[in-house]
């Protein structure tokens, strides 16, 4: 005797060797012997063989009309033999019974199991939903096959193009677009990136890196919601006798800082460092704050930037010339002769901004000799530079002194051997680049007088405010460095600690609240300190050991690293483009590091580091012949 039985979701057949009350010993056609529970046996028969019965039953089941079978089936619970009798004939054959069993078992959208060989009809609405889902699945599979075929032929379907960066970097492996790429990649034996490049999905190397950056850091886009900058409610006093001026480049719209000098010739000079004060109007948790916190910083890249705050908000608080602007001011008093710091004071006030100086327009005029020797004149000296010449001269003298004092603490001079490089995309005018623009690269010597004036003033403000918050027990976001020993990096934390690299006792970023979120957070803390003094720790928005402050620190670190990494990658991209556009095939370079099979070199006149073949001593000067610049440009963001 043979039996058909269910085992682990399958129907198997075999010859009965022996049988007890509740089970049977069955030999399969493979020769394997198994113990089968009696309840799992659904058919007993003498002939044909189990293999023949199963094959005939499956073939017959495939021809059954499931809609008709569902109509014929009883409303209550029924067995497969009952359906065979209703569907085929009153006395169905063994093969017909097996066919009914297989059809019922393999159509769960029509019939639900009610036991071994027992079933119930699914409700009509469930059947319709299931059939619709099956049809949808078939349509999706057909679409996947069609898209995969197009990709293999070098054509990129629009839906795949729209999901390109998600497919490459954060795929939904159940999405049909992803499955189409996988199928096409398998069929064509090409890597997904190569496949998509060949299909024209990637417009250009620049667009690839740009869209990837946006996908990873701005998945919802770079636009802003509709926001209104709140007015500052405080009645702020006017800074009497102050004529402040900012020093930035011509592309800067987020003018965070300005300087003023009072008391020249009196023996005591007061230097004012005036910082834009969005913190006087924006509150932690407000809609604008949430936008700033999500971005953490303005993103800079050659020819373009993504601002932390909307232009309308920046315009409300920026230190634009010709008006009295709200500011958080640090006044530092110095002995005019010795330049010894005598005292500091913080004020919340309105500051008259007399001028916005632009160093790219003034660097050729405002030189160290011009600042130190009043007899030197230039015919083309801008009126603003001439107007503030005495103040700039004092600030430059002070900046050199402050730098020298820091270098004593630091233990060695700061190195300004390499210049800053400025990138300009011709005809871009601040619009989003395409990657095809003509690029100009110019240099600006680090430590130039105007640069030195601004940097030393900001270090003075950041270190003074950082120390003041620490004295009051008010937490902030600090940057510190334990020593200048190799491997000791700058870290961020919430406590005032020394910064060995700068040579200061503490350093809290506070001077760029329109473009760095850390500075806005610190400004809230500084405002609380200015208003409440010794009780500021109780009134400040962020308290000691505030979990939210640590969350901000962590988020800022991650965002700032990503933004700087992208900026560096794009500067490399445009440098390679510059080489290509200018037809430069050789570069003067200096070896900076040994590599296993060569050396790493830095170009002497461009912001470019690259490997060369052959062992070279560190510091050696080389003339390097370049090759494959166009290909390298495609890796600009790596």
What are these model-derived regions, one by one?
Residues 1-8, 589:
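A short beta-strand micro-motif
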Residues 5-9, 17-22, 27-32:
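N-terminal basic/disordered segments at the start of proteins
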């Amino acid at each position: 005797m043979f039996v058909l039985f269910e085992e682990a979701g399958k129907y198997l057949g075999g010859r009965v060797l022996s049988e007890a009350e509740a089970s049977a010993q069955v030999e399969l056609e493979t020769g394997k012997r198994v113990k089968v529970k009696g309840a799992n046996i659904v058919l007993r028969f003498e002939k044909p063989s189990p293999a023949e019965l199963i094959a005939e039953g499956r073939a017959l089941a495939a021809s059954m009309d499931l809609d008709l079978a569902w109509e014929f089936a009883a409303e209550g619970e029924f067995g497969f033999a009952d359906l065979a009798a209703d569907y085929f004939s009153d006395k169905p054959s063994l093969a017909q019974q097996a066919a009914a069993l297989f059809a019922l078992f393999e159509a769960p959208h029509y019939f639900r199991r009610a036991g071994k060989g027992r079933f119930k009809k699914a409700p009509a609405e469930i059947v319709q939903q299931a059939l619709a889902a099956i049809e949808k699945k078939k349509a999706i599979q057909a679409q996947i096959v069609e898209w995969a075929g197009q990709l293999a032929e070098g054509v990129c379907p629009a839906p795949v193009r729209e999901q390109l960066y998600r497919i490459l970097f954060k795929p939904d492996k159940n999405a049909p677009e992803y499955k189409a790429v996988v199928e096409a990649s398998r069929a064509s034996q090409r890597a997904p990136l190569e496949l998509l490049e060949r299909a024209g999905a990637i417009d250009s190397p620049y667009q690839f890196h740009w869209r990837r950056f946006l996908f990873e850091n701005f998945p919802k886009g770079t636009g802003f919601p509709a926001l209104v900058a709140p007015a500052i409610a405080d009645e702020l006093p006017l800074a009497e006798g102050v004529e402040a001026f900012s020093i930035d480049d011509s592309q800067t719209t987020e003018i965070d800082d300005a300087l003023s000098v009072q008391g020249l010739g009196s023996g005591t000079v007061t230097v004012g460092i005036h910082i834009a004060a969005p913190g006087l109007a924006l509150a932690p948790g407000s809609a604008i704050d949430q936008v700033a916190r999500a971005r953490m910083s303005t993103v800079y890249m050659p020819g373009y930037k993504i601002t932390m705050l909307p232009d309308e908000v920046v315009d409300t608080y920026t230190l634009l010339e010709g008006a009295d602007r709200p500011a958080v001011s640090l006044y530092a008093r110095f002995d005019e002769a010795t330049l010894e710091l005598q005292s500091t004071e913080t004020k919340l006030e309105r500051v008259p901004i007399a001028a916005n100086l632009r160093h790219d327009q003034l660097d050729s005029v405002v030189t160290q000799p011009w600042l130190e020797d009043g007899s030197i004149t230039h015919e083309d000296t801008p009126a603003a530079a001439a107007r503030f010449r005495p103040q700039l001269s004092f600030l430059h003298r002070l900046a050199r002194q402050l730098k020298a004092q820091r270098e004593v603490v630091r233990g060695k001079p700061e190195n300004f051997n390499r210049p800053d490089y400025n990138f300009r995309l011709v005809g871009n005018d601040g619009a989003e680049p395409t990657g095809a623009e003509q690029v100009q690269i110019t240099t600006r010597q680090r430590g130039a007088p105007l640069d030195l004036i601004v940097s030393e003033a900001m270090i003075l403000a950041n270190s003074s405010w950082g120390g003041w918050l620490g004295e009051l027990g008010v937490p902030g976001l600090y940057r510190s460095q334990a020593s200048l020993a190799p491997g000791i990096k700058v870290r961020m934390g919430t406590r005032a600690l020394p910064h060995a690299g700068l040579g200061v006792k503490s350093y809290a970023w506070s001077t760029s609240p329109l473009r760095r979120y850390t500075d806005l957070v610190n400004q809230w803390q500084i405002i609380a300190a200015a208003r409440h003094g010794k009780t500021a720790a109780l009134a400040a928005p962020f308290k000691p050991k505030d979990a939210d402050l640590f969350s901000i620190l962590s988020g800022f670190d991650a965002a700032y690293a990503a933004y700087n990494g992208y900026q560096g990658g794009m500067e490399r991209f445009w440098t390679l483009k510059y080489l290509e556009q200018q037809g430069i095939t050789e570069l003067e370079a200096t070896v900076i590091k040994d590599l296993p099979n060569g050396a790493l070199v830095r170009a002497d006149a461009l912001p470019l580091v690259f490997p060369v073949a052959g062992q070279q001593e560190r510091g050696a000067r080389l003339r390097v012949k370049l090759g494959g610049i166009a290909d390298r440009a495609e890796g600009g963001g790596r």
